[in-house]
């Protein structure tokens, strides 16, 4: 296979090229590329000194922090396999993941709602618990750094080796482990850089040492890896947010002069609904991208007004195919007009035949950005891979200009009698109603029609929503078979860690 520089060598190169320039900012402390190399290589040796070896699985269960960045780099520099675990998950879910992947070590914090010792008792393969706080019962993260050498030998890592297992959020079912190899961890940064060569984004998306981002998305998400690989490849710096808070995000953008941001739709909406937002102009931003879930163009246009010097973009990606796959143009953020060169993408019908322009089909992809499959799930892999193509479950169509429009997931089709209802269509209509912040449509069992539509909405701050008014509104805007049997108004809709609405949790609410 082709020879490319491993993470260890990229860190060495970045320290030489960018040296004392800032790689990360955390709690107002700036961490240079030179310090990054010193500390990461010490941590890498600390992990090796524990007896961990290539192929061993090491979980990171932390909120966003500098220790998270160091852990990623150290694991990748030694040929270990990183298991980033969403910090919202419970101990039972961690135990399930740990047993599924045969976890060997975990880097975590004592600030959790369970006894860490329970993990060791419940996961037979777990040998090492490393905490970022000093505790005599566990390995201390900073002791591994302070007591180790900063000279790290080449570990002989092949790009075909497993590098990461991302346990997907389980929005529509049980979480699954998406396996990446050591080449995949480079591709996201390279595809982001490639986006900047798209003629409609020239001199806008630069991805270089002149750029700075604020990171509100969880580092456990596959998109969180962007910040780490972009830094050591291209010199872009990142301000780390421990957790998303809309006002704090705005303040950090202003304070540190961030040039770009990428977030989930719910995060953009949270910023827009801040009472204090009228006091801010995010004039340092050059580009802002929404990703991770369907978004309303109206929402993004409202955000654009806060950023007088920025273009607003829509990105499409998924954990199973190194994101981003596609990006919109600034002129049409509803459609995706640029597809990265690492993949082939087409739309097929239920008989695996490519559909014509304007016809709806399932998005299938092939290429080196496609993941290696679901870890230890051979039957599932047989279902989602056919003739080298990965079937994403996402549905869309191409217009005559070859712009891709996504309309939802195949799992989000609600079969009402003999009719097919697209949940995304109903959600889009609901989001146009004044005062609705979030909306979700799901199918629920019905003895006569098989399924019927049920909707859940969350109001904007200080807005009072009336169920009967909402039902009347939908009767005027939707065909009868698409109209929901019921609408439930909640303060907030349940989310997964990356900010997607959790429809499985909604269905469990009844």
Give the positions of each predicted feature:
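Conserved pre-ATP/AMP-binding loop-to-beta segment of ANL
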Residues: 20, 136, 149-167, 173-174, ...
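Structural core segment of the AMP-binding/adenylate-forming
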Residues: 49-50, 77-143, 461-463
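AMP-binding/adenylate-forming catalytic core of the ANL superfamily
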Residues: 89, 95-96, 106-108, 261, ...
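Conserved AMP-binding A3 loop
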Residues: 32-34, 163-191
């Amino acid at each position: 296979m082709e020879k490319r520089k491993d993470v260890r060598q990229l860190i060495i190169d970045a320290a030489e090229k960018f040296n004392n320039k800032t790689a990360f900012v955390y709690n107002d402390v700036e961490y240079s590329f030179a310090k990054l190399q010193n500390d990461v290589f010490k941590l890498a040796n600390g992990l090796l000194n524990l007896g961990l070896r290539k192929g061993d699985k090491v979980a990171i269960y932390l909120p966003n922090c500098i220790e998270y960045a160091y852990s990623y780099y150290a694991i990748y520099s030694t040929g270990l396999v990183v298991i980033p675990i969403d910090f919202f998950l419970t101990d039972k879910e961690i135990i399930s993941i740990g047993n599924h992947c045969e976890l060997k070590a975990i880097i975590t914090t004592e600030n959790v709602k369970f006894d860490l010792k329970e993990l060791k008792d419940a996961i037979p393969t777990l040998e090492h618990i490393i905490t970022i706080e000093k505790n005599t019962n566990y390995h201390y993260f900073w002791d591994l750094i302070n007591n180790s050498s900063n000279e790290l030998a080449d570990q002989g890592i092949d790009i075909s080796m497993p590098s990461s297992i991302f346990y997907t959020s389980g929005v529509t079912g049980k979480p699954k482990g998406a396996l990446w190899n050591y080449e995949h961890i480079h591709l996201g940064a390279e595809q982001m850089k490639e986006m900047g060569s798209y003629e409609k984004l020239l001199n806008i998306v630069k991805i270089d040492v002149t750029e700075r981002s604020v990171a509100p998305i969880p580092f456990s998400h596959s998109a969180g890896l962007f910040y780490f690989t972009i830094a050591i490849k291209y010199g872009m710096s990142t301000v780390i947010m421990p957790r998303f808070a809309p006002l704090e995000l705005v303040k950090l953008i202003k304070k540190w002069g961030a040039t770009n941001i990428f977030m989930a739709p719910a995060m953009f909406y949270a910023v827009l609904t801040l009472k204090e937002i009228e006091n801010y102009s995010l004039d340092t931003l050059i580009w802002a991208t929404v990703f991770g879930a369907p978004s309303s163009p109206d929402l993004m246009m409202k955000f654009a007004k806060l950023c007088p010097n920025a273009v607003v973009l829509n990105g499409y990606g998924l954990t199973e195919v190194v994101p981003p796959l596609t990006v919109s143009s600034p002129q049409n953020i509803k459609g995706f007009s640029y597809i990265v060169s690492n993949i082939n993408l087409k739309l097929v019908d239920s008989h695996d035949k490519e559909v014509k322009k304007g016809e709806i089909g399932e998005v299938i992809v092939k290429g080196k950005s496609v993941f290696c499959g679901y870890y230890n799930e051979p039957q599932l892999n047989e279902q989602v891979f056919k003739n080298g193509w990965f079937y994403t479950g996402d549905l869309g169509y191409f217009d005559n200009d070859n712009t891709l429009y996504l309309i939802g997931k195949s799992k989000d089709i609600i079969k009402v009698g003999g009719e097919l209802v697209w949940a995304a269509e109903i959600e889009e209509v609901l989001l146009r109603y004044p005062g609705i912040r979030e909306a979700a449509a799901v199918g629920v069992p019905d003895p006569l029609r098989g399924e019927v539509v049920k909707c859940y909405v969350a109001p904007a701050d200080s807005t009072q929503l009336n169920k009967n008014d909402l039902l009347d509104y939908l009767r005027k805007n939707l065909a009868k078979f698409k109209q929901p049997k019921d609408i439930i108004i909640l303060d907030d809709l349940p989310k997964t860690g990356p900010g997607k609405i959790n429809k499985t949790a909604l269905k469990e609410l009844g």
